[in-house]
Regions:
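Nucleic acid-binding interface residues in structured DNA/RNA-binding domains
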Residues: 2-119
């Protein structure tokens, strides 16, 4: 079992309060899905969009995640693009993923066959 530092955050009342205070229902939906991604797995922006019923809005998901720190601490590092590419300019993302056991096929791309949350 991989140690997940985010799992304790999900169990606290303070955490639930932060989520319930979101003014944007869409952001709430997106971040609720993101917090379900287990350590050692990744999901794509498109997969998250599809799960919330907005299949064509992967860029919207990316936009919400770029401001997720406004809502609390979420494991946004577990979200990559449809090719498994990590976010350009976010150097820490790879380190966070590797610490959870996520494997990479090259410098910037997660091994999606091995690490995809939704298959």
């Amino acid at each position: 079992m991989i140690d997940d530092p985010f799992s304790d955050l999900l169990k606290t009342n303070k955490r639930k309060d932060n989520i319930s205070k979101l003014n944007d229902d869409l952001a709430y939906e997106i971040l609720s899905v993101v917090e379900e991604i287990p350590a050692g797995r990744v999901a794509t922006y498109g997969q998250i969009a599809k799960l919330i019923g907005r299949e064509k809005n992967s860029r919207l998901v990316a936009g919400v995640l770029s401001h997720a720190e406004n809502y609390g601490k979420f494991p946004c590092h577990r979200v990559v693009n449809h090719k498994g590419r990590t976010a350009p300019g976010w150097r820490e993302q790879r380190s966070l993923l590797e610490a959870e056991g996520v494997s990479f096929r090259d410098e910037n791309h997660v091994d999606m066959k091995a690490c995809s949350w939704l298959g």
